[in-house]
Amino acid sequence: MAFAASQQLNRYYNLYKNIDVTFSKEVVSTLNFEPKQVFVRCSGGQWPCIINSASMTKAKIICGKKSGFLARLRSGITSVNIRFAFFDTEGKDSLSFFVAAKLVGISSYEAGNQDLVLITFEYTQRAPDDLIEKLGILLEANINSQKRRNERVVITPEISRKIGLVEKGTVVYIDAVPRRCLIRDLSFSGAKILLVGIANFLINKEVILRFAFDDPQSVFGIKGKTVRTEPVEGRKDLVALAVQYYPKNIPMMYKMYLNKYFSVVRKPASDGFGDDFLEDVAPASSFTPVSSPIGTNTAPLTPPPADSAPEQIS
């Protein structure tokens, strides 16, 4: 088991080591990152800072121009230790570690901002396994969500356990009205659900589909639109309803849960590969870093209670 884990970490590192992850509000939440416990240490002192972005080989931090840390750097100090900190939502011990790094450059944080600077550091040794694992899982899920966006995962009891889906039965809000439904299959871009109803009255409707996952526990909704209906064989009272998510409303957590299936699944035979083919999910040449796909200005969507109209989802 330890050998398999080591192989996976090496795979993450070799594939994704140079891809920057911007620590947007959503990424911070997804990784259980603890910004208040982050600081940089050098020359016998330590100062709080903000992680702007990080990869498995470097990090960019934000600090004030009047910071004593910046003065140390300008005095010729180039070696530092950056503290990363993560908390556990299920009450386990928190995780923190230092990463040794050297100064690469200092620049203005953003045009017009006279108070903050952006400082780039390069790690002087391979990143800790915990950082490689956390960034690797997130990056693989984000890449798979683009490369495999339309591949459907039929929800069986075994698949539900694997991806952490609490149950197939859930609630879908159709034009703000809650309806009970069953999840038949999922993809990174949508879902197919079964519910009682008349097809003509369910097409082209605004919906929010509610999900509950374990490991870690999370409840959220994804906003989308019904795009197609299909009859259910032997059940005239039921309709199969295809939901297409709005891309900007797909939480990173959803991608990570669903990717638990794709992270070890063999490619289907229909793609021209045998059952023993295990695909390495390498970033495509056109892949945009996580800095862009994960929105920095959208708050996670919280599903509305059943007795109220739904509201909307870094």
From Swiss-Prot:
Alphabetical list of Pfam families matching this protein: PilZ, PilZN3
Family matches, as InterPro entries: PilZ_domain, PilZN3
Gene Ontology MF terms in the entry: cyclic-di-GMP binding
Effect of loss of the gene: Mutants are less motile, reverse more frequently than the wild-type cells, and form less biofilm. Invasiveness and ability to induce skin abscesses and host humoral immune responses are significantly attenuated.
Cystines in this chain: none
Domain of life the protein comes from: Bacteria
Keywords for this protein: c-di-GMP
Free-text function comment from the UniProt entry: Cyclic-di-GMP binding protein that plays important roles in motility, chemotaxis, biofilm formation and virulence.
Protein name: Cyclic di-GMP binding protein TDE_0214
Organism listed in the record: Treponema denticola (strain ATCC 35405 / DSM 14222 / CIP 103919 / JCM 8153 / KCTC 15104)
